[in-house]
Amino acid sequence: MSFLANEASSESIASFSKPEIMSSFLPEGGCYELLSVIGKGFEDLMTVNSRYKPTGEYVTVRRINLEACSNEMVTFLQGELHVSKLFSHPNIVPYRATFIADNELWAVTSFMAYGSAKDLIGTHFMDGMSELAIAYILQGVLKALDYIHHMGYVHRSVKASHILISTDGKVYLSGLRSNLSMISHGQRQRAVHDFPKYSIKVLPWLSPEVLQQNLQGYDAKSDIYSVGITACELANGHVPFKDMPATQMLLEKLNGTVPCLLDTSTIPAEELTMSPSRSIANPGLNDSLAAGSLRPANGDSPSHPYHRTFSPHFHNFVEQCLQRNPDARPNASTLLNHSFFKQIKRRASEALPELLRPVTPITSFEGSQSQDHSGILGLVTNLEDLEVDDWEF
């Protein structure tokens, strides 16, 4: 059944997209100059880099063809728009406007000029980011999760591609469409049992109790497990359990396989002297140390990409997040006071741009003059390298 054939659903979606509900941008398609398609997803979802004409600001417009939406997807979108209306936090991606344009739902957000954390490790930090950069990023994520959990929701999709970084180095958590309320009939439930829809892309990050789908269910502590997996993803340059069949992944997690940070304290010394292709792959830790690239310099023997040492505080932080028993995991508020974050001395907006060098925000490719078309072309070219189809605003 097409979306427009379902009048009740159409009216419900439209009610969430009235201008008084979302913030500051005009809810009119003519106000946006669509520059380039930078991502496509399921259900005819299209992400377009755009310019908001009244101010010249770059924005991201997510366009969803409502005629192609299934009824299940309509329900999914209604939940996402409801949460977007409900939440207001400096570390959660805000909607600037949502509205219906012809047969499409348009959702407008500020453009994140550094892209996602996944973009960064995929293009510049293939062997992982610095510990301090990760501390700043995860602090922003945990602040967002602490708010979400206090609002009675479970996020269920914490991963690097849902961590966005703005031009000024601010960290935002996205992926709100996967959020699930733990409130039922006015009461907060001790556990929920719903398995995330469209979850195939988030399986490596899901906790054992979510994957197990048993009568015990899961709660907000499942997000903490995902934070631990994301910490490994940012530090190692790839997510644990990557490309592992779902059944094997479940068995590894249920049997207590715990991913870790890859450095001199977790990799045997003899492996650090081998080329990555000879290193032993440990399921759950990394698919293959060959994922790291060697960097020879001046003809010298190449060093192993994981010949580094993370602090004991960082290792302990990850261990706390990845405990098999969810009751043993700290909550987001407690983790924000973990010793791992003591190294943070400045605001993320002041420190992250320096820590992410030589990466520059994409808006820096824009010319100084508004009619500099070469600057626009450079911006569009660099946008095409981003994996924005994974950004779920």
UniProtKB/Swiss-Prot annotation:
Keyword Cell cycle: yes
Subcellular location: Nucleus; Cytoplasm
Gene3D superfamilies associated with the record: Phosphorylase Kinase, domain 1, Transferase(Phosphotransferase) domain 1
Sorted UniProt keywords: Cell cycle, Cytoplasm, Nucleus, Phosphoprotein
Keyword Secreted: no
Record PTM Phosphoserine, positions in chain: S2, S9
Stated role: Pseudokinase which, in complex with CAB39/MO25 (CAB39/MO25alpha or CAB39L/MO25beta), binds to and activates STK11/LKB1. Adopts a closed conformation typical of active protein kinases and binds STK11/LKB1 as a pseudosubstrate, promoting conformational change of STK11/LKB1 in an active conformation.
Protein name per the record: STE20-related kinase adapter protein alpha
Species for this entry: Rattus norvegicus (Rat)
